Every structure is written in structure tokens, then in C-alpha cells.
């Protein structure tokens, strides 16, 4: 295998060189030169032969002499093949040529072959047994970039990748086994020798193994390719008739096999590529870019007929103002170099539509002089066009033509005499009045200049996208007026406040009043009226106006009917009120149901512990006799307001300071841990918290219960003191909210259990609201005067009797004195009578103890626990220690 540097691929063929300027004939006449006359005759015959080729004129003009001869031979061979292949029987091959030619002339009027090639996703390729391209369709240019004239009668190996040439040669052989002597030179391409077969050696043409389907890579010159394009070849081997080739001995060779295949890209094209391939069109222009011709695709895309396109004058009239200078630069480059290069700009299509195209223009010469311009346009999408526009240079010559200044009627840096699209100051002025005053006449500029082309453009093409013209007959206008007149009164009754609130209502009302005057007042000149032109340019018709009026009608009618606008509604207060009512209406039973299951499992453990302590206490002698139970009603009178005096409860004196009751809502405080049950080791309990409002009405059942006497405790502390000798606490007074913040614990908060505290079992309890001062530890004064509660002393205890300010008191409490060393709770059960009555107001019962705790509470009778804030249960001894 030879090196890659020596491998040659097909490239663009050389073009016809530019001829020198013809020198003037001297006065003495033409000198006789046989060689010069021979060359002139040869050139004349070649030009006449080239004119007979079935190619466009722009292709013929760039062909050199060798290309003209090559294509002429190829055309003659193709014609001979069709002369034989189109005949039905061998008998007609001699005498039926005239009839066949007549049929071909009739078929020339039908261009279905061209349409089939356009619809085909690929191109047609015919390759002979000696690897020459016998025929290639014109659509090969869309896939490989080569023109049809560049590949016909050329070696196919120049188009095939070196690694795929052997496979392509194998597919050309009828037995897929080419002769080893017939090798392929990878450096030059064509085979070393050709092998011809007789009909006896070849299989029938319709044999199944004559079909071919394979893949190989072909040379591609398009910009979107990496150099090669993978193609799929599908076809079969057929006999190539009418070639009349002769062997080395001069004998006529029989027809040989050739590959007739359709080459399609291996990767299916995208939708954009399909659209682009199908809409590539070409236009023909003069040297000043005046259009003189357009193909069928161009007429389909732009919408113009060839007459409309060629009678407008300069081609710059079809170019967007923002792209004129950019195209002029490419135009000058084409005049100098012969090709403009890829240029992206906007073309004006029919019905004031702009189409982005990518164009490449070439200069065509005739007789050594530039004759005309051939431009190939490829349509682009709007997104692609905007991308190219952003990449374009925005220097000063393009500042006025970018579209932001002139096209949308914003102030421009040019003087008024150079402004092609002046600003319209009066909308009610007809075009005949203002055009001569602010716009220079087109006669002031050269007809082929850019300014003249810009002036000749219609102003409306730069204002907005086009829309279908609205029907402006009198019947349509009167129908619109009759439909709109029924709600004019209700619209006027809406008031000035609604008009100020919705600005568009005023505009709709003005249009409605204008329509009420009739079509004669609105459009006196119909289509020549200036208002109609503005509406047409803006894409607004009467159907849009009617829709706007209907929308404003429904909006105004609902406002006039007394409905409140949603924007004026402040729902903050309503939301807060709803939340507060929901909290106030929450039932107290939910709290009871939630608290009881949490500590139900602790009751059994507590009872066992209490029984054990009772057995230990019975073994010790009692220090003193227990006092009989006393009624709480003997201490407090429900009809009397308590003053600043001492009250004795079960032999215990406490100082009560009357203060007005404070109602509060419990704010969410930071998490705090409280060791409430110190008698149990290693047990945790969760106390869910839900804020309650102390103003919720509720009922409470009171029933007498039989409570056993408390067990006897240590004799170290005696709590019966005279009330007058009771000394007030020396601790500073705190706020009512301090203890509330202490009690509030978020839901599902785990608390550690202090083994030194007493454990209680939750039973049926009474719900109530409570506020108290936070219990603060302090030093003990004297054992005789007062027992000070300290959270640090284990087993410190007292008990607290239930206080009721109003109503009948049927509950009795023992006057038994508790010891500091142990904390004992009773295990008796309550026996209530179903009697419900409103809870009396006990908020006036206030007092202060040594720990400065002030509370509103209701105590459980059987377990000695107090329900605080509907969510917290404390032992009786904990509250006793606060008194």
C-alpha cells in the first residue's frame, strides 16, 4: 500500500481560463498564420459542441476543452444506450428509430423525472465494469458537493475512500470474485487491466444474485462533512447496451455488466436538511444585481413570478435594509475575485415576508468578459439567521442598518435628507401629503444606488409581520356596530373609577365610540384611509377589536355589578381569625385522649414502687398521729373575694397576693428538659404540646371521693405554722409568662426521668388553664419557719390541695404531713357522679409562695396530679414543694 501523501481524490475540476482581451484588428489586415487559424477553428467547434450539451449555460461556460470532449463522449454513449434499451423488440432496433424519437420528444414535455430525483433521498449512479462513472444524476451535488459534469466519465475510485475501493471492486464483479490480476492501484485509482466476458460466461440479467446492497465512503466537499460521507448503495448488475466497444483485435465486444444503483446517505437526514435540500434555488442577475431569471423553486419560495421579479429594477429592493451594505460588500468581492462567498441576508418574499437565505454568487464570463451573475440561495430558519446576524460586524456603516433605528422608527444618526424612512408625526396625514415633505425623491439618487433602492421599498414591510387583510365591506362593519351597541350603556355606567383602574377600558371605549359613527366616518376613503393603513400594518382587523371589546365588557360588567376585585381583598385578617377560632374550638377531650396512652405503661410500675414504700413505712413507728381530714370549704368561702391575707390549707399556711388575672397565649419557646419523675430510673416520656386558650368554655365534674390516709413519713419537718408568723418570700417577683415559657415543651420532646422524683399514674383528670411563676431554688431559712423547695434536694416534697373559689366542695384532703425523705402517692381510684357544671372563675384566686409560684389549676383527686395547660401532668408533691 502506498503512502497517504500519494493518494489522490477527486476535487473540483479546473475551469475554463479567462481569455485575454481581444486585440483590435490592425489596419493593414490579418496576417496569414496556419496554426492560429487551426486553433481558431478548433475553438469554434468546441464552443458549438459545448452548446449542444444538455447542461445549463452557467455550467457550459466554465468547462474547459477536455471537459467538453469528455462530456460529449459521455452524452453520446448515454444516447446510444437509451436508443437500444427503450426499444421493446429487436426487430424495432433498425426501423423504429424515428418512432422512438417521436415518443422521446413527447416525453420531454413531462418533467416527472426531475421531480422523482428531487423526491429521492439520494442520487442515481451507473458505474461500468471498468469503474467509470457512466451516469450520475444532478442531485449528486446536494450530497457530495460535486456537480454532475465533474464526475461523469471519471474513475469512480477517485470518489471512494481508499479502504473501501477493494470492496467496491468486488461488488462490480458478477461472481463477487474479481480476478487477482485486476488490482486497484490505491495511488491512482483505476484498475490495471479490464476483463471482458462473453454472454456465455455471464448469468442471466434477472438472476437474484445480481442484486447488490453494500456500503462505502465517498468523497464529500460540503461544509457540513468531515471529508467523506458514508453511503448505502442498493441496486443490481445490468447489461449496458449500445456501447459498441471493440477488443484488441478489432472485434465488437458484447454488452458488459454495469452497476445501476441508488446511493443514499447511511445516516437519515434531519428535517432541517430535508427542507434545505428541497428548497435550494438559483437566480440569475446582471452585473448590478438586477434579477433577470429565477428557477421554479425560487418562484415557489419567494412567491413571485419571473415577470414580477425581473421588472422591479435593482435586486437590492428585495434585500433588507439592515443587510444592504453587507451584501454590497460581498458584491464588490465577487466582482474582484469572481465569487462572493457565503453571505447570509434577508430576502423580501411576496406578501411582505422576510426570508433568511444563505447565498453564494459567482461571476460568469462570456468571451473573456463578465457577463452575468448566478446566485445559489439556501433558505435558513429565523434562529440561524439571527445567529449569523450577531456574528456580523457592527461597525459604523452597519449602525444605521441594523434595524433598531430606522426599521422601528427610532431616531437615526443621519440627517433628514438621508433618512429613507422618516418618522411619521401625524397619523391623520395622508401619504401624499407627508411623503414629499420629509422624504427626498427617488430621482435625487442614481437608479442603481442603494439609497434609491431603499426609497423604493414600502415602509410597511419594516413595521410588523404581515397579516391577512380584513374584510372592510359595509355589511361587516354594520354587523360589528350592532353587536357592540348593546353594551355601550353598561360600559358607560361603570364609572370613572373603573376606567382609571383598568387603562385599556378607555381605549376600547374610544374604539367603540368610533365604530358607533358608522363605516363612513371611520373609513371615509376605505382602503386609502390612513387609519386603515395603520391597522393593516399592525395586523389588527375588526375581529380583534371585537374580541377586545367583549373582554372589556365582561370585566367592566362584573365590576359594575358590585363584585369585589380580587386584588383589593386582604385575606390576612380572615386567615388569622379562622386559625384563632380553630384553636379556641378545639375540644379538651383530645388532650385527655392523647395524654392517657403516653403514660399508661408507667402506672403499673408506679403502683409496685408505692406498695414497696408503704411496706417499708409500716415497719417504722409513726412519728405523730395523723390529723383528720378537713374540708376545703372551711378555709375558703366561695362567696368572698380573697384579700391579701394568709390562708390555711390542710394545716399549711401560704401567702396569697391578689393580682388581676392575665390571659395569654402560649408562645413557642426553646426546648427545655424537666425531670418530673425522679422515682423511676432510666425511663423517658414524651409530652406533646398543643397551645390552648384560657378563655375556652368547658365543664368539670365534681364528685366526692374517698381518699385513704397518706402513709407516715419522717418527723423532721412540720408544716403547720400560724398564718400571722408566715414570712413572705425574699425571692424577686417574676412575670406571669416566665412559668408559661417553662411549661411549654414542643410535641414529641423526650424528657429524662429523674429517679429522685415521685412517679404518678395518669387517671381521669380535669382540664383547666393554669399560669404560675417559675419555681426557683433558694436557701432554706429554718426548719421551723418554712420548708423551701429545692430542685437539687432529692425527695423534697409537700402536697398541694385542690382549690376551688366558687361552688360546692365535696372533695376532702388529708392533713397528713409529708416527709422530706420520701415521696408517696396514693393509689386510690376516683368514684365520680356524673354531674357536669360550668367551671367557676377561679382567676381571682392568686397567691404567692416561697418559690413565687402563682397558678390556676385543678388537681386530680385520686393520683394527686395537676393538669397544667391541658398538656402537662405534674406530681402532687412537685406542686406541694412550691407552696
Curated annotation (Swiss-Prot):
Record gene name: Ahr
GO molecular function: E-box binding; nuclear receptor activity; protein heterodimerization activity; protein homodimerization activity; sequence-specific double-stranded DNA binding
A GO BP entry: circadian regulation of gene expression
Oligomer and partners: Homodimer. Heterodimer; efficient DNA binding requires dimerization with another bHLH protein. Interacts with ARNT; the heterodimer ARNT:AHR binds to core DNA sequence 5'-TGCGTG-3' within the dioxin response element (DRE) of target gene promoters and activates their transcription. Binds MYBBP1A. Interacts with coactivators including SRC-1, RIP140 and NOCA7, and with the corepressor SMRT. Interacts with NEDD8 and IVNS1ABP. Interacts with BMAL1. Interacts with HSP90AB1. Interacts with TIPARP; leading to mono-ADP-ribosylation of AHR and subsequent inhibition of AHR.
Reported modifications of this chain: Mono-ADP-ribosylated, leading to inhibit transcription activator activity of AHR.
UniProt region (Disordered), positions on chain: 1-38, 421-449
Main location: cytoplasm
High-level lineage: Eukaryota, Metazoa, Chordata, Craniata, Vertebrata
Residue ranges, annotated region (Required for maintaining the overall integrity of the AHR:ARNT heterodimer and its transcriptional activity): 49-81, 116-124, 260-262
Database matches in CDD domains: bHLH-PAS_AhR (cd11436), PAS (cd00130)
Propeptide: 1-9
Origin species: Mus musculus molossinus (Japanese house mouse)
Protein name: Aryl hydrocarbon receptor
Amino acid at each position: 500500500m502506498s503512502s497517504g501523501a500519494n493518494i489522490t481524490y477527486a476535487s473540483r475540476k479546473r475551469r475554463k481560463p479567462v481569455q485575454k482581451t481581444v486585440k483590435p484588428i490592425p489596419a493593414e489586415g490579418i496576417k496569414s498564420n496556419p496554426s492560429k487559424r487551426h486553433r481558431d477553428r478548433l475553438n469554434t467547434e468546441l464552443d458549438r459542441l459545448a452548446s449542444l450539451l444538455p447542461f445549463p449555460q452557467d455550467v457550459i461556460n466554465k468547462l474547459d476543452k477536455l471537459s467538453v470532449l469528455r462530456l460529449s463522449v459521455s452524452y453520446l454513449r448515454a444516447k446510444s444506450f437509451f436508443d437500444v434499451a427503450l426499444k421493446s423488440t429487436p426487430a424495432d432496433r433498425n426501423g423504429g428509430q424515428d418512432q422512438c424519437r417521436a415518443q422521446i420528444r413527447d416525453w420531454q414535455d413531462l418533467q416527472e423525472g426531475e421531480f422523482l430525483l428531487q423526491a429521492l433521498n439520494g442520487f442515481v449512479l451507473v458505474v461500468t465494469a471498468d469503474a467509470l462513472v457512466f451516469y450520475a444524476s444532478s442531485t449528486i451535488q446536494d450530497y457530495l458537493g460535486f456537480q454532475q459534469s465533474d464526475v461523469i466519465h471519471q474513475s469512480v475510485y477517485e470518489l471512494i475512500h481508499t479502504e473501501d475501493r477493494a470492496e467496491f471492486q468486488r461488488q462490480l464483479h458478477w461472481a463477487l470474485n474479481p480476478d487477482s490480476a485486476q488490482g486497484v492501484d490505491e495511488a491512482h485509482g483505476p484498475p490495471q487491466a479490464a476483463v471482458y466476458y462473453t454472454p456465455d460466461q455471464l448469468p442471466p440479467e434477472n438472476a437474484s444474485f445480481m442484486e447488490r446492497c453494500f456500503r462505502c465512503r465517498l468523497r464529500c466537499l460540503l461544509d457540513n462533512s468531515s471529508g467523506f460521507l458514508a453511503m448505502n448503495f442498493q441496486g443490481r448488475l445490468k447489461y449496458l447496451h449500445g456501447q459498441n466497444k471493440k477488443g484488441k483485435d478489432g472485434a465488437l465486444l458484447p454488452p458488459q455488466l454495469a452497476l445501476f444503483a441508488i446511493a443514499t446517505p447511511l445516516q437519515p437526514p434531519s428535517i432541517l436538511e430535508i427542507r434545505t435540500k428541497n428548497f435550494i434555488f438559483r437566480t440569475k442577475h446582471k452585473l448590478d444585481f438586477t434579477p433577470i431569471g429565477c428557477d421554479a423553486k425560487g418562484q415557489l419560495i419567494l412567491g413571485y413570478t419571473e415577470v414580477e421579479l425581473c421588472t422591479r429594477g435593482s435586486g437590492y429592493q428585495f434585500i433588507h435594509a439592515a443587510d444592504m451594505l453587507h451584501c454590497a460588500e460581498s458584491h464588490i468581492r465577487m466582482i474582484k475575485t469572481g465569487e462572493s462567498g457565503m453571505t447570509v441576508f434577508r430576502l423580501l418574499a411576496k406578501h411582505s415576508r422576510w426570508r433568511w437565505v444563505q447565498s453564494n454568487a459567482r461571476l460568469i464570463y462570456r468571451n473573456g468578459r463578465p457577463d452575468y451573475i448566478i446566485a445559489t440561495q439556501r433558505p435558513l430558519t429565523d434562529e440561524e439567521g439571527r445567529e449569523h446576524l450577531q456574528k456580523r460586524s457592527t461597525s459604523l456603516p452597519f449602525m444605521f442598518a441594523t434595524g433598531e433605528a430606522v426599521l422601528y422608527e427610532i431616531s437615526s444618526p443621519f440627517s433628514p435628507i438621508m433618512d429613507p424612512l422618516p418618522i411619521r408625526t401625524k397619523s391623520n396625514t395622508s401619504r401624499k401629503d407627508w411623503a414629499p415633505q420629509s422624504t427626498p425623491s427617488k430621482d435625487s439618487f442614481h437608479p442603481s444606488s442603494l439609497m434609491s433602492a431603499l426609497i423604493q421599498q414600502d415602509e410597511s414591510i419594516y413595521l410588523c409581520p404581515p397579516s391577512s387583510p380584513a374584510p372592510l365591506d359595509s355589511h361587516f362593519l354594520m354587523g360589528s356596530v350592532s353587536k357592540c351597541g348593546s353594551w355601550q350603556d353598561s360600559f358607560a355606567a361603570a364609572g370613572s373609577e373603573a376606567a382609571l383602574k383598568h387603562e385599556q377600558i378607555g381605549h376600547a371605549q374610544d374604539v367603540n365610540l368610533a365604530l358607533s359613527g358608522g363605516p363612513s366616518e371611520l373609513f371615509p376613503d376605505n382602503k386609502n384611509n390612513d387609519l386603515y393603513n395603520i391597522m393593516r400594518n399592525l395586523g389588527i382587523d375588526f375581529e380583534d377589536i371585537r374580541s377586545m371589546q367583549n373582554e372589556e365588557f365582561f370585566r367592566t360588567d362584573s365590576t359594575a355589578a358590585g363584585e369585589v376585585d380580587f386584588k383589593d381583598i386582604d385575606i390576612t385578617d380572615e386567615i388569622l381569625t379562622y386559625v384563632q377560632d380553630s384553636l379556641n374550638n378545639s375540644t379538651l377531650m383530645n388532650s385527655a385522649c392523647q395524654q392517657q396512652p403516653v403514660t399508661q405503661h408507667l402506672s403499673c410500675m408506679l403502683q409496685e414502687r408505692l406498695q414497696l414504700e408503704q411496706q417499708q413505712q409500716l415497719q417504722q413507728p409513726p412519728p405523730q398521729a395523723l390529723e383528720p381530714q378537713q374540708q376545703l370549704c372551711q378555709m375558703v368561702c366561695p362567696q368572698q373575694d380573697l384579700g391579701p391575707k394568709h390562708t390555711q390549707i390542710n394545716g399549711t399556711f401560704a401567702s396569697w397576693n391578689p393580682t388581676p388575672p392575665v390571659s395569654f397565649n402560649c408562645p413557642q419557646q426553646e426546648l427545655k428538659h424537666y425531670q418530673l419523675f425522679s422515682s423511676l430510673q432510666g425511663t423517658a416520656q414524651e409530652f406533646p404540646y398543643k397551645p390552648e386558650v384560657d378563655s375556652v368554655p368547658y365543664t368539670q365534674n365534681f364528685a366526692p371521693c374517698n381518699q385513704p390516709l397518706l402513709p407516715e413519713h419522717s418527723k423532721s419537718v412540720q408544716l403547720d405554722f400560724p398564718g400571722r408568723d408566715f414570712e413572705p418570700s425574699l425571692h424577686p417577683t417574676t412575670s406571669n409568662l416566665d412559668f408559661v415559657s417553662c411549661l411549654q415543651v414542643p410535641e414529641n420532646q423526650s424528657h429524662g426521668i429523674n429517679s429522685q422524683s415521685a412517679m404518678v399514674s395518669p387517671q381521669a383528670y380535669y382540664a383547666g388553664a393554669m399560669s404560675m411563676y417559675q419555681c426557683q431554688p433558694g436557701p432554706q431559712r429554718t426548719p421551723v419557719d418554712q420548708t423551701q423547695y429545692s430542685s437539687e434536694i432529692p425527695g423534697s416534697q409537700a402536697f398541694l390541695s385542690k382549690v376551688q373559689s366558687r361552688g360546692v366542695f365535696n372533695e376532702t384532703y388529708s392533713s397528713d404531713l409529708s416527709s422530706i425523705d420520701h415521696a408517696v402517692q396514693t393509689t386510690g381510684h376516683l368514684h365520680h357522679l356524673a354531674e357536669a357544671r360550668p367551671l367557676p372563675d377561679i382567676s381571682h384566686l392568686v397567691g404567692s409562695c416561697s418559690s413565687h409560684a402563682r397558678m390556676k389549676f385543678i388537681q386530680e383527686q385520686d393520683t394527686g396530679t395537676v393538669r397544667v395547660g391541658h398538656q402537662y401532668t405534674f406530681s402532687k408533691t412537685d406542686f406541694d414543694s412550691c407552696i
